[in-house]
């Protein structure tokens, strides 16, 4: 059955295939346009450089009027990412707009990696470290990057 949400997701997928933003990829799981797997590559010249981070995106029939549920499957250490992989990002909550597509969502998450908001922490330890001990924070991020190479 082709619903407005499914049509929009097909359009998002085609756009992502034909004009993929640098450092991100995503596709629906087999036979389920409402559930996507995605990968964000750590941006160059940052502590995240070289990392390969997996995410899942769960869309509802209310998409694009409501945002998907997005979470990292990969283990993360970041001020705005909860232990369960959920992401504290305004466009996934109160700043959502139907103009955002999958590419915009993933690009925003990639930007968040390098530009966290320690004033809205999902991980208080990472937020404190980011603000008070950047060297140790970067070391912990590098550990997560190395783990991303071997994680399933």
Swiss-Prot record:
Disulfide bonds: none annotated. Its EC number is 2.3.2.23. Gene3D superfamilies: Ubiquitin Conjugating Enzyme (3.10.110.10). Pathway: Protein modification; protein ubiquitination. GO terms for molecular function: ATP binding; ubiquitin conjugating enzyme activity. InterPro entries: Ub_conjugating_enzyme, UBQ-conjugat_E2_core, UBQ-conjugating_AS, UBQ-conjugating_enzyme/RWD. The active site is at residue 88. Keywords: ATP-binding, Nucleotide-binding, Transferase, Ubl conjugation pathway. GO terms for biological process: protein ubiquitination. SMART domains: UBCc. It catalyses: S-ubiquitinyl-[E1 ubiquitin-activating enzyme]-L-cysteine + [E2 ubiquitin-conjugating enzyme]-L-cysteine = [E1 ubiquitin-activating enzyme]-L-cysteine + S-ubiquitinyl-[E2 ubiquitin-conjugating enzyme]-L-cysteine. The keyword Hydrolase does not apply. Residues 4-150 form the UBC core domain. Catalyzes the covalent attachment of ubiquitin to other proteins. PANTHER family: UBIQUITIN-CONJUGATING ENZYME E2. This is Ubiquitin-conjugating enzyme E2 2. It comes from Medicago sativa.
